[in-house]
Protein backbone atom coordinates (compact mmCIF):
# COMPACT_ATOMS: atom_id res chain seq x y z
CA UNK A 1 0.00 0.00 0.00
CA UNK A 2 1.21 3.48 -0.84
CA UNK A 3 1.60 6.39 1.48
CA UNK A 4 -1.66 8.18 2.23
CA UNK A 5 -2.05 11.90 1.96
CA UNK A 6 -2.93 14.13 4.86
CA UNK A 7 -6.54 14.57 3.63
CA UNK A 8 -7.07 10.80 3.52
CA UNK A 9 -5.73 10.38 7.02
CA UNK A 10 -8.04 13.15 8.32
CA UNK A 11 -11.00 11.48 6.57
CA UNK A 12 -10.21 8.12 8.21
CA UNK A 13 -10.01 9.76 11.62
CA UNK A 14 -13.32 11.57 11.11
CA UNK A 15 -15.05 8.36 9.99
CA UNK A 16 -13.38 5.52 11.94
CA UNK A 17 -14.07 2.00 10.71
CA UNK A 18 -16.09 -0.13 13.13
CA UNK A 19 -14.19 -3.13 14.47
CA UNK A 20 -15.93 -6.49 14.40
CA UNK A 21 -16.30 -8.54 17.59
CA UNK A 22 -17.80 -12.01 17.32
CA UNK A 23 -19.24 -12.03 20.87
CA UNK A 24 -20.89 -8.61 20.44
CA UNK A 25 -22.32 -9.67 17.10
CA UNK A 26 -23.84 -12.89 18.51
CA UNK A 27 -25.31 -10.98 21.45
CA UNK A 28 -26.87 -8.42 19.14
CA UNK A 29 -28.33 -11.13 16.91
CA UNK A 30 -29.82 -13.12 19.77
CA UNK A 31 -31.09 -10.37 22.06
CA UNK A 32 -31.46 -6.98 20.41
CA UNK A 33 -32.27 -7.74 16.77
CA UNK A 34 -35.01 -10.36 17.05
CA UNK A 35 -37.75 -7.75 16.36
CA UNK A 36 -36.03 -5.85 13.56
CA UNK A 37 -37.10 -5.64 9.89
CA UNK A 38 -35.91 -8.13 7.33
CA UNK A 39 -34.30 -5.52 5.09
CA UNK A 40 -32.44 -4.01 7.95
CA UNK A 41 -31.28 -7.43 9.08
CA UNK A 42 -30.13 -8.36 5.58
CA UNK A 43 -28.15 -5.13 5.23
CA UNK A 44 -26.62 -5.61 8.62
CA UNK A 45 -25.68 -9.18 7.78
CA UNK A 46 -23.98 -8.09 4.56
CA UNK A 47 -22.10 -5.38 6.41
CA UNK A 48 -21.10 -7.94 9.01
CA UNK A 49 -19.78 -10.26 6.34
CA UNK A 50 -17.62 -7.50 4.91
CA UNK A 51 -16.42 -6.55 8.37
CA UNK A 52 -15.58 -10.17 9.12
CA UNK A 53 -13.40 -10.43 6.05
CA UNK A 54 -11.91 -6.97 6.24
CA UNK A 55 -8.83 -8.07 8.16
CA UNK A 56 -8.18 -11.05 5.88
CA UNK A 57 -5.05 -11.03 3.72
CA UNK A 58 -4.92 -12.19 0.14
CA UNK A 59 -3.13 -15.54 0.12
CA UNK A 60 -2.29 -17.64 -2.92
CA UNK A 61 -3.00 -21.35 -3.12
CA UNK A 62 -0.53 -23.58 -1.37
CA UNK A 63 1.95 -25.74 -3.21
CA UNK A 64 0.18 -28.91 -2.05
CA UNK A 65 -3.05 -27.81 -3.69
CA UNK A 66 -1.23 -26.87 -6.88
CA UNK A 67 0.53 -30.25 -7.01
CA UNK A 68 -2.54 -32.31 -6.14
CA UNK A 69 -5.16 -30.35 -7.99
CA UNK A 70 -5.98 -33.19 -10.40
CA UNK A 71 -5.56 -36.04 -7.88
CA UNK A 72 -7.79 -39.04 -8.65
CA UNK A 73 -8.91 -40.80 -5.44
CA UNK A 74 -11.33 -43.25 -7.04
CA UNK A 75 -15.08 -43.60 -7.39
CA UNK A 76 -15.63 -43.72 -3.66
CA UNK A 77 -14.26 -40.22 -3.32
CA UNK A 78 -15.81 -38.78 -6.49
CA UNK A 79 -17.58 -35.43 -6.35
CA UNK A 80 -18.15 -32.08 -7.90
CA UNK A 81 -15.99 -29.08 -7.21
CA UNK A 82 -18.04 -26.21 -5.81
CA UNK A 83 -17.35 -23.04 -3.96
CA UNK A 84 -18.48 -22.00 -0.50
CA UNK A 85 -20.63 -19.23 -1.93
CA UNK A 86 -22.74 -21.70 -3.90
CA UNK A 87 -23.25 -23.82 -0.78
CA UNK A 88 -24.35 -20.86 1.35
CA UNK A 89 -26.72 -19.64 -1.41
CA UNK A 90 -28.52 -23.02 -1.48
CA UNK A 91 -29.01 -22.86 2.28
CA UNK A 92 -30.45 -19.36 2.06
CA UNK A 93 -32.92 -20.46 -0.65
CA UNK A 94 -34.24 -23.30 1.52
CA UNK A 95 -34.69 -20.93 4.46
CA UNK A 96 -36.64 -18.43 2.32
CA UNK A 97 -39.00 -21.18 1.09
CA UNK A 98 -39.80 -22.22 4.66
CA UNK A 99 -40.53 -18.66 5.68
CA UNK A 100 -42.82 -18.21 2.69
CA UNK A 101 -44.89 -21.27 3.61
CA UNK A 102 -45.28 -20.07 7.16
CA UNK A 103 -46.51 -16.68 6.00
CA UNK A 104 -49.14 -18.32 3.77
CA UNK A 105 -50.48 -20.35 6.67
CA UNK A 106 -50.80 -17.29 8.85
CA UNK A 107 -52.71 -15.37 6.18
CA UNK A 108 -55.49 -17.98 5.80
CA UNK A 109 -58.55 -17.28 8.10
CA UNK A 110 -60.03 -20.75 7.78
CA UNK A 111 -57.04 -22.33 9.31
CA UNK A 112 -57.27 -19.96 12.27
CA UNK A 113 -60.92 -20.81 12.85
CA UNK A 114 -60.37 -24.51 12.73
CA UNK A 115 -57.40 -24.20 15.03
CA UNK A 116 -59.43 -22.19 17.56
CA UNK A 117 -62.28 -24.74 17.53
CA UNK A 118 -59.91 -27.64 18.01
CA UNK A 119 -58.18 -25.81 20.80
CA UNK A 120 -61.49 -25.14 22.58
CA UNK A 121 -62.46 -28.81 22.34
CA UNK A 122 -59.09 -29.79 23.69
CA UNK A 123 -59.52 -27.37 26.57
CA UNK A 124 -62.91 -28.88 27.46
CA UNK A 125 -61.46 -32.38 27.46
CA UNK A 126 -58.55 -31.23 29.58
CA UNK A 127 -60.91 -29.63 32.08
CA UNK A 128 -63.01 -32.81 32.40
CA UNK A 129 -59.89 -34.93 32.80
CA UNK A 130 -58.51 -32.54 35.39
CA UNK A 131 -61.81 -32.70 37.33
CA UNK A 132 -61.68 -36.51 37.29
CA UNK A 133 -58.07 -36.44 38.42
CA UNK A 134 -58.95 -34.04 41.22
CA UNK A 135 -61.67 -36.37 42.47
CA UNK A 136 -59.30 -39.34 42.35
CA UNK A 137 -56.58 -37.44 44.18
CA UNK A 138 -59.08 -36.34 46.84
CA UNK A 139 -60.14 -39.94 47.40
CA UNK A 140 -56.52 -41.06 47.56
CA UNK A 141 -55.72 -38.28 50.01
CA UNK A 142 -58.62 -39.27 52.25
CA UNK A 143 -57.54 -42.93 52.17
CA UNK A 144 -53.96 -41.92 52.90
CA UNK A 145 -54.97 -39.78 55.88
CA UNK A 146 -57.11 -42.64 57.22
CA UNK A 147 -54.21 -45.08 56.88
CA UNK A 148 -51.85 -42.64 58.56
CA UNK A 149 -54.23 -42.16 61.46
CA UNK A 150 -54.55 -45.93 61.87
CA UNK A 151 -50.78 -46.33 61.73
CA UNK A 152 -50.27 -43.62 64.33
CA UNK A 153 -52.83 -45.28 66.59
CA UNK A 154 -51.10 -48.66 66.25
CA UNK A 155 -47.70 -47.12 66.93
CA UNK A 156 -48.97 -45.32 70.01
CA UNK A 157 -50.54 -48.53 71.34
CA UNK A 158 -47.34 -50.46 70.69
CA UNK A 159 -45.26 -47.77 72.35
CA UNK A 160 -47.54 -47.80 75.38
CA UNK A 161 -47.33 -51.59 75.53
CA UNK A 162 -43.51 -51.48 75.39
CA UNK A 163 -43.38 -48.83 78.11
CA UNK A 164 -45.69 -50.85 80.34
CA UNK A 165 -43.65 -53.99 79.77
CA UNK A 166 -40.38 -52.20 80.53
CA UNK A 167 -41.82 -50.65 83.67
CA UNK A 168 -43.15 -54.04 84.76
CA UNK A 169 -39.77 -55.72 84.15
CA UNK A 170 -38.00 -52.89 85.98
CA UNK A 171 -40.34 -53.25 88.95
CA UNK A 172 -39.81 -57.03 88.97
CA UNK A 173 -36.04 -56.55 88.87
CA UNK A 174 -36.27 -54.06 91.72
CA UNK A 175 -38.29 -56.52 93.81
CA UNK A 176 -35.80 -59.31 93.07
CA UNK A 177 -32.88 -57.07 93.95
CA UNK A 178 -34.50 -56.07 97.23
CA UNK A 179 -35.13 -59.73 98.08
CA UNK A 180 -31.48 -60.58 97.33
CA UNK A 181 -30.30 -57.74 99.55
CA UNK A 182 -32.50 -58.99 102.38
CA UNK A 183 -31.08 -62.49 101.96
CA UNK A 184 -27.53 -61.12 102.09
CA UNK A 185 -28.34 -59.17 105.24
CA UNK A 186 -29.79 -62.27 106.88
CA UNK A 187 -26.76 -64.32 105.88
CA UNK A 188 -24.40 -61.66 107.25
CA UNK A 189 -26.27 -61.53 110.55
CA UNK A 190 -26.09 -65.33 110.90
CA UNK A 191 -22.36 -65.31 110.15
CA UNK A 192 -21.87 -62.49 112.66
CA UNK A 193 -23.62 -64.47 115.39
CA UNK A 194 -21.58 -67.56 114.44
CA UNK A 195 -18.36 -65.56 114.77
CA UNK A 196 -19.39 -64.43 118.25
CA UNK A 197 -20.13 -67.99 119.33
CA UNK A 198 -16.84 -69.34 117.93
CA UNK A 199 -14.69 -68.09 120.80
CA UNK A 200 -16.95 -69.53 123.49
CA UNK A 201 -17.14 -72.81 121.55
CA UNK A 202 -13.35 -73.06 121.42
CA UNK A 203 -13.03 -72.32 125.13
CA UNK A 204 -15.62 -74.96 126.00
CA UNK A 205 -13.29 -77.63 124.63
CA UNK A 206 -10.81 -76.83 127.42
CA UNK A 207 -13.25 -77.94 130.14
CA UNK A 208 -12.43 -81.17 131.99
CA UNK A 209 -13.62 -84.37 130.42
CA UNK A 210 -15.00 -85.96 133.58
CA UNK A 211 -16.78 -84.51 136.57
CA UNK A 212 -14.46 -86.33 138.96
CA UNK A 213 -11.43 -84.49 137.59
CA UNK A 214 -13.26 -81.18 137.98
CA UNK A 215 -14.21 -81.86 141.58
CA UNK A 216 -10.88 -83.32 142.57
CA UNK A 217 -8.52 -80.75 141.07
CA UNK A 218 -10.29 -77.58 139.86
CA UNK A 219 -13.54 -77.20 141.83
CA UNK A 220 -14.16 -74.33 144.22
CA UNK A 221 -17.09 -73.20 146.33
CA UNK A 222 -18.61 -71.18 143.47
CA UNK A 223 -18.13 -73.82 140.78
CA UNK A 224 -21.66 -75.24 141.02
CA UNK A 225 -23.15 -71.76 140.91
CA UNK A 226 -21.26 -70.85 137.75
CA UNK A 227 -22.16 -74.15 136.12
CA UNK A 228 -25.87 -73.62 136.76
CA UNK A 229 -25.73 -70.08 135.36
CA UNK A 230 -23.92 -71.29 132.27
CA UNK A 231 -26.43 -74.08 131.64
CA UNK A 232 -29.34 -71.66 132.01
CA UNK A 233 -27.78 -69.30 129.48
CA UNK A 234 -27.23 -72.17 127.06
CA UNK A 235 -30.88 -73.18 127.39
CA UNK A 236 -31.94 -69.58 126.77
CA UNK A 237 -29.81 -69.55 123.63
CA UNK A 238 -31.48 -72.74 122.43
CA UNK A 239 -34.92 -71.23 123.10
CA UNK A 240 -34.10 -68.16 121.04
CA UNK A 241 -32.76 -70.32 118.18
CA UNK A 242 -35.94 -72.44 118.14
CA UNK A 243 -38.11 -69.31 118.18
CA UNK A 244 -36.12 -67.81 115.32
CA UNK A 245 -36.44 -70.96 113.23
CA UNK A 246 -40.21 -71.13 113.76
CA UNK A 247 -40.52 -67.45 112.82
CA UNK A 248 -38.58 -67.97 109.60
CA UNK A 249 -40.69 -71.01 108.72
CA UNK A 250 -43.87 -68.96 109.10
CA UNK A 251 -42.40 -66.05 107.12
CA UNK A 252 -41.48 -68.27 104.19
CA UNK A 253 -44.94 -69.91 104.38
CA UNK A 254 -43.40 -73.31 104.98
CA UNK A 255 -45.87 -73.96 107.76
CA UNK A 256 -49.53 -73.06 107.72
CA UNK A 257 -51.36 -71.70 110.72
CA UNK A 258 -52.78 -75.13 111.51
CA UNK A 259 -49.40 -76.88 111.22
CA UNK A 260 -47.47 -74.32 113.26
CA UNK A 261 -45.97 -76.01 116.34
CA UNK A 262 -46.74 -74.83 119.80
CA UNK A 263 -44.25 -72.66 121.61
CA UNK A 264 -41.59 -74.79 123.29
CA UNK A 265 -41.60 -73.89 126.97
CA UNK A 266 -41.16 -76.97 129.16
CA UNK A 267 -41.16 -76.75 132.93
CA UNK A 268 -37.90 -78.62 133.23
CA UNK A 269 -35.56 -78.07 130.34
CA UNK A 270 -33.38 -80.98 129.34
CA UNK A 271 -31.17 -81.66 126.36
CA UNK A 272 -33.35 -84.51 125.10
CA UNK A 273 -36.37 -82.21 124.88
CA UNK A 274 -34.44 -79.76 122.75
CA UNK A 275 -33.24 -82.56 120.48
CA UNK A 276 -36.85 -83.67 119.90
CA UNK A 277 -37.97 -80.11 119.10
CA UNK A 278 -35.15 -79.53 116.62
CA UNK A 279 -35.86 -82.93 115.01
CA UNK A 280 -39.47 -81.91 114.32
CA UNK A 281 -38.36 -78.66 112.72
CA UNK A 282 -35.79 -80.51 110.62
CA UNK A 283 -38.42 -82.89 109.21
CA UNK A 284 -40.65 -79.94 108.26
CA UNK A 285 -37.73 -78.07 106.70
CA UNK A 286 -36.56 -81.08 104.69
CA UNK A 287 -39.52 -80.93 102.28
CA UNK A 288 -39.13 -77.21 101.72
CA UNK A 289 -35.37 -77.54 101.25
CA UNK A 290 -35.69 -80.25 98.59
CA UNK A 291 -38.22 -78.24 96.56
CA UNK A 292 -36.16 -75.03 96.73
CA UNK A 293 -32.89 -76.75 95.81
CA UNK A 294 -34.42 -78.57 92.82
CA UNK A 295 -36.14 -75.38 91.62
CA UNK A 296 -33.09 -73.10 91.69
CA UNK A 297 -30.64 -75.73 90.44
CA UNK A 298 -32.83 -76.30 87.35
CA UNK A 299 -33.08 -72.54 86.79
CA UNK A 300 -29.31 -72.14 87.02
CA UNK A 301 -28.76 -74.97 84.53
CA UNK A 302 -31.28 -73.48 82.11
CA UNK A 303 -29.71 -70.03 82.38
CA UNK A 304 -26.20 -71.38 81.89
CA UNK A 305 -27.25 -73.38 78.82
CA UNK A 306 -24.89 -75.71 77.02
CA UNK A 307 -21.83 -74.50 78.95
CA UNK A 308 -23.11 -75.93 82.23
CA UNK A 309 -23.98 -79.24 80.55
CA UNK A 310 -20.60 -79.56 78.87
CA UNK A 311 -18.73 -78.54 82.04
CA UNK A 312 -20.53 -81.10 84.20
CA UNK A 313 -20.53 -83.90 81.64
CA UNK A 314 -17.26 -85.49 82.68
CA UNK A 315 -17.47 -84.74 86.41
CA UNK A 316 -17.53 -87.57 88.92
CA UNK A 317 -20.46 -85.95 90.73
CA UNK A 318 -22.93 -85.13 87.99
CA UNK A 319 -25.92 -84.86 90.29
CA UNK A 320 -28.41 -82.27 91.36
CA UNK A 321 -27.85 -80.06 94.39
CA UNK A 322 -30.54 -81.86 96.36
CA UNK A 323 -28.95 -85.26 95.73
CA UNK A 324 -25.52 -83.98 96.75
CA UNK A 325 -26.90 -82.65 100.05
CA UNK A 326 -28.64 -85.96 100.72
CA UNK A 327 -25.45 -87.91 100.00
CA UNK A 328 -23.40 -85.71 102.33
CA UNK A 329 -25.91 -85.98 105.17
CA UNK A 330 -26.29 -89.72 104.76
CA UNK A 331 -22.71 -90.34 105.94
CA UNK A 332 -23.29 -88.90 109.39
CA UNK A 333 -20.53 -90.94 111.05
CA UNK A 334 -17.88 -89.29 108.88
CA UNK A 335 -19.24 -85.81 109.64
CA UNK A 336 -19.23 -86.49 113.39
CA UNK A 337 -15.70 -87.84 113.18
CA UNK A 338 -14.53 -84.62 111.49
CA UNK A 339 -15.89 -82.59 114.41
CA UNK A 340 -13.76 -84.62 116.84
CA UNK A 341 -10.43 -83.70 115.25
CA UNK A 342 -8.29 -81.56 117.52
CA UNK A 343 -7.18 -78.99 114.91
CA UNK A 344 -6.25 -76.31 117.43
CA UNK A 345 -4.37 -78.77 119.66
CA UNK A 346 -6.62 -78.00 122.57
CA UNK A 347 -5.60 -79.72 125.80
CA UNK A 348 -8.53 -80.22 128.19
CA UNK A 349 -7.95 -79.70 131.87
CA UNK A 350 -6.71 -82.88 133.51
CA UNK A 351 -5.88 -84.59 130.24
CA UNK A 352 -2.29 -85.53 129.42
CA UNK A 353 -0.97 -86.79 126.15
CA UNK A 354 1.38 -89.72 126.48
CA UNK A 355 3.15 -92.15 124.24
CA UNK A 356 3.30 -95.88 124.72
CA UNK A 357 6.33 -97.59 126.22
CA UNK A 358 6.92 -99.49 123.00
CA UNK A 359 7.39 -96.25 121.09
CA UNK A 360 9.91 -95.05 123.69
CA UNK A 361 11.99 -98.27 123.56
CA UNK A 362 11.90 -98.29 119.76
CA UNK A 363 13.10 -94.71 119.64
CA UNK A 364 15.91 -95.52 122.09
CA UNK A 365 17.16 -98.42 119.97
CA UNK A 366 17.26 -96.25 116.88
CA UNK A 367 19.28 -93.60 118.70
CA UNK A 368 21.80 -96.22 119.85
CA UNK A 369 22.35 -97.43 116.33
CA UNK A 370 22.85 -93.94 114.89
CA UNK A 371 24.98 -92.14 117.45
CA UNK A 372 26.48 -89.71 114.94
CA UNK A 373 23.07 -88.44 113.82
CA UNK A 374 21.74 -85.65 116.04
CA UNK A 375 18.75 -86.42 118.15
CA UNK A 376 15.45 -85.11 116.86
CA UNK A 377 12.66 -84.29 119.21
CA UNK A 378 9.83 -85.71 117.15
CA UNK A 379 6.27 -84.79 117.88
CA UNK A 380 4.02 -87.27 116.23
CA UNK A 381 1.11 -86.17 114.11
CA UNK A 382 -1.13 -88.29 116.29
CA UNK A 383 -0.89 -85.73 119.05
CA UNK A 384 -1.35 -82.83 116.60
CA UNK A 385 -4.52 -84.19 115.01
CA UNK A 386 -5.69 -86.69 117.56
CA UNK A 387 -9.36 -87.44 117.99
CA UNK A 388 -11.02 -86.44 121.23
CA UNK A 389 -14.57 -87.55 121.87
CA UNK A 390 -15.18 -84.71 124.32
CA UNK A 391 -14.53 -81.78 121.92
CA UNK A 392 -16.45 -80.19 119.07
CA UNK A 393 -14.35 -78.52 116.35
CA UNK A 394 -15.93 -77.51 113.01
CA UNK A 395 -13.18 -75.13 111.99
CA UNK A 396 -13.11 -76.40 108.39
CA UNK A 397 -16.76 -75.44 107.86
CA UNK A 398 -16.22 -72.18 109.74
CA UNK A 399 -13.33 -71.26 107.43
CA UNK A 400 -15.48 -71.92 104.36
CA UNK A 401 -18.12 -69.54 105.70
CA UNK A 402 -15.52 -66.87 106.43
CA UNK A 403 -13.99 -67.20 102.95
CA UNK A 404 -17.41 -66.80 101.34
CA UNK A 405 -18.10 -63.75 103.47
CA UNK A 406 -14.75 -62.14 102.64
CA UNK A 407 -15.13 -62.80 98.91
CA UNK A 408 -18.61 -61.30 98.91
CA UNK A 409 -17.43 -58.20 100.75
CA UNK A 410 -14.51 -57.72 98.35
CA UNK A 411 -16.71 -58.07 95.27
CA UNK A 412 -19.33 -55.69 96.66
CA UNK A 413 -16.74 -53.03 97.53
CA UNK A 414 -14.63 -53.42 94.39
CA UNK A 415 -16.55 -54.68 91.34
CA UNK A 416 -13.29 -55.03 89.38
CA UNK A 417 -12.02 -57.80 91.64
CA UNK A 418 -12.33 -61.55 91.79
CA UNK A 419 -13.71 -63.21 88.70
CA UNK A 420 -13.98 -59.92 86.80
CA UNK A 421 -10.24 -59.36 87.10
CA UNK A 422 -9.46 -62.84 85.78
CA UNK A 423 -11.84 -62.42 82.84
CA UNK A 424 -10.38 -59.03 81.96
CA UNK A 425 -6.84 -60.37 82.18
CA UNK A 426 -7.74 -63.22 79.83
CA UNK A 427 -9.34 -60.82 77.36
CA UNK A 428 -6.34 -58.50 77.43
CA UNK A 429 -3.99 -61.43 76.94
CA UNK A 430 -5.96 -62.47 73.88
CA UNK A 431 -5.90 -58.95 72.45
CA UNK A 432 -2.20 -58.26 72.84
CA UNK A 433 0.20 -59.97 70.50
CA UNK A 434 2.80 -62.31 71.89
CA UNK A 435 6.29 -60.91 72.09
CA UNK A 436 8.18 -63.45 69.99
CA UNK A 437 11.90 -63.03 69.50
CA UNK A 438 12.44 -63.87 65.83
CA UNK A 439 16.22 -63.63 66.15
CA UNK A 440 16.31 -66.60 68.52
CA UNK A 441 15.64 -69.14 65.75
CA UNK A 442 18.26 -71.34 64.07
CA UNK A 443 20.64 -71.05 67.00
CA UNK A 444 21.38 -67.38 66.45
CA UNK A 445 20.64 -66.56 70.07
CA UNK A 446 21.24 -68.51 73.25
CA UNK A 447 18.03 -69.26 75.11
CA UNK A 448 18.16 -69.45 78.87
CA UNK A 449 15.77 -69.15 81.80
CA UNK A 450 16.69 -67.60 85.12
CA UNK A 451 15.87 -70.02 87.91
CA UNK A 452 14.14 -68.49 90.88
CA UNK A 453 15.76 -68.69 94.27
CA UNK A 454 14.94 -71.80 96.22
CA UNK A 455 13.19 -70.35 99.24
CA UNK A 456 11.21 -72.27 101.86
CA UNK A 457 12.15 -75.53 100.16
CA UNK A 458 11.83 -77.37 103.46
CA UNK A 459 10.34 -76.01 106.64
CA UNK A 460 12.84 -75.70 109.50
CA UNK A 461 12.59 -78.27 112.22
CA UNK A 462 12.79 -77.04 115.77
CA UNK A 463 13.31 -80.44 117.39
CA UNK A 464 16.99 -80.75 116.43
CA UNK A 465 19.28 -80.41 119.38
CA UNK A 466 23.07 -80.94 119.39
CA UNK A 467 25.21 -81.48 122.38
CA UNK A 468 28.52 -79.71 123.01
CA UNK A 469 30.68 -82.52 121.58
CA UNK A 470 28.83 -82.50 118.26
CA UNK A 471 29.12 -78.73 117.99
CA UNK A 472 32.87 -78.86 118.70
CA UNK A 473 33.36 -81.64 116.17
CA UNK A 474 31.48 -79.71 113.51
CA UNK A 475 33.51 -76.50 113.86
CA UNK A 476 36.79 -78.45 114.18
CA UNK A 477 36.20 -80.28 110.88
CA UNK A 478 35.20 -77.28 108.78
CA UNK A 479 38.61 -76.99 107.03
CA UNK A 480 39.03 -80.68 106.30
CA UNK A 481 41.02 -81.43 109.44
CA UNK A 482 40.01 -83.12 112.61
CA UNK A 483 41.17 -81.39 115.81
CA UNK A 484 41.04 -82.94 119.24
CA UNK A 485 39.60 -80.19 121.42
CA UNK A 486 39.03 -82.26 124.55
CA UNK A 487 39.90 -80.52 127.79
CA UNK A 488 43.06 -81.77 129.65
CA UNK A 489 44.40 -81.15 133.09
CA UNK A 490 46.94 -78.47 133.85
CA UNK A 491 49.62 -81.08 134.61
CA UNK A 492 49.24 -82.58 131.17
CA UNK A 493 49.47 -79.06 129.66
CA UNK A 494 52.91 -78.62 131.18
CA UNK A 495 54.03 -81.97 129.91
CA UNK A 496 52.70 -81.38 126.37
CA UNK A 497 54.20 -78.63 124.25
CA UNK A 498 51.03 -78.07 122.19
CA UNK A 499 47.60 -77.32 123.58
CA UNK A 500 45.87 -79.02 120.65
CA UNK A 501 46.76 -82.20 118.87
CA UNK A 502 46.25 -81.97 115.17
CA UNK A 503 45.50 -85.22 113.42
CA UNK A 504 45.94 -85.61 109.69
CA UNK A 505 42.77 -86.01 107.71
CA UNK A 506 41.20 -89.47 107.86
CA UNK A 507 38.64 -91.05 105.63
CA UNK A 508 35.82 -90.85 108.19
CA UNK A 509 36.13 -87.10 108.81
CA UNK A 510 33.33 -84.65 107.98
CA UNK A 511 34.28 -82.33 105.12
CA UNK A 512 32.70 -79.19 103.79
CA UNK A 513 35.60 -77.60 101.86
CA UNK A 514 38.02 -80.56 101.33
Curated annotation (Swiss-Prot):
Source organism superkingdom = Eukaryota
Biased composition range(s): Basic and acidic residues: 25-42, 135-144
Keywords of the record:
Nucleus
Primary site of residence: nucleus
Q: Which GO terms describe its biological process?
A: maturation of SSU-rRNA from tricistronic rRNA transcript (SSU-rRNA, 5.8S rRNA, LSU-rRNA)
Q: Which InterPro entries does the entry mention?
A: AATF, AATF/Bfr2, AATF_C
Chain intervals with Acidic residues compositional bias: 118-134
The record's subcellular locations are: Nucleus, Nucleolus
Q: Name one GO cellular component term.
A: nucleolus
What ranges does the record list as Polar residues composition bias? 354-378
Region ranges (Disordered): 14-153, 353-382
**Keyword flag Cytoplasm:** no
Concerning its family, UniProt says: Belongs to the AATF family.
Classification via PANTHER family:
AATF PROTEIN APOPTOSIS ANTAGONIZING TRANSCRIPTION FACTOR, PROTEIN AATF
- What is this protein called in UniProt? Protein BFR2
Which species expresses this protein natively? Debaryomyces hansenii (strain ATCC 36239 / CBS 767 / BCRC 21394 / JCM 1990 / NBRC 0083 / IGC 2968) (Yeast)
High-level lineage? Eukaryota, Fungi, Dikarya, Ascomycota, Saccharomycotina
